[in-house]
Amino acid sequence: MTPRLRLQPESVGIGMTSQRVRDRLVERLREAGIQDEATLNAMRTVPRHLFIDEALASRAYEDTALPIGHGQTISQPWVVARMTEAVLQVTPAKVLEVGTGSGYQGAILAALGLEVYTVERIGDLLRQARKRFRHLGMNVRSKHDDGRIGWPEHGPYDAIVVTAAAPALVDALVDQLAVGGRLVAPVGGPSSQSLVQLTRGADGAIEQQVLAPVTFVPLLSGMLD
């Protein structure tokens, strides 16, 4: 897969947001075990500094989570890359993201040419993410709703990426996973979470694998404007 992205000159970045700095981040991700070249190319192409507050732009290409308001964060780049790499292994066409947040994970998936549907419970975050998608020329379908419900009208999905942690995998989301599809989600409570990969086999059987220890904000129900 080749990233498809239209960057305006002002989006390219300078200094601590320059392409050179993005390239260094990609090399750190490679050294940390990310192997999929399409994922690395998407991380190199999508300007993470556009998805955070301007005051934090100089930290955009650190391998760390950063605050985006409303008690939420933009995920650590390694985690975004690992989740993306995991779902790409099943060669998906249509992906559901639960928890749009800043829009960065959805943008990475869209840059890979995938058909992306994303759901966010916090209206203000979704409005900002939509502006970023438009600015980058990305056709990401988005919805303001309770992410735990998913978006069943457009299912089933070849891949589902959940960007907030629940104590257990949410049945309503698993039910929207296509045969041969893969769901990647953080599972656990505030003190201990694991990134879990769930794959639905051709016979409908579910196979589960733990990928890594992680720390995510909680997956909450309901909606906020």
From Swiss-Prot:
Its EC number is 2.1.1.77. One of its GO terms (cellular component) is cytoplasm. Keywords: Cytoplasm, Methyltransferase, S-adenosyl-L-methionine, Transferase. It holds the Pfam family PCMT. GO terms for molecular function: protein-L-isoaspartate (D-aspartate) O-methyltransferase activity. Disulfide bonds: none annotated. It is found in: Cytoplasm. This is Protein-L-isoaspartate O-methyltransferase. It comes from Xanthomonas euvesicatoria pv. vesicatoria (strain 85-10) (Xanthomonas campestris pv. vesicatoria).
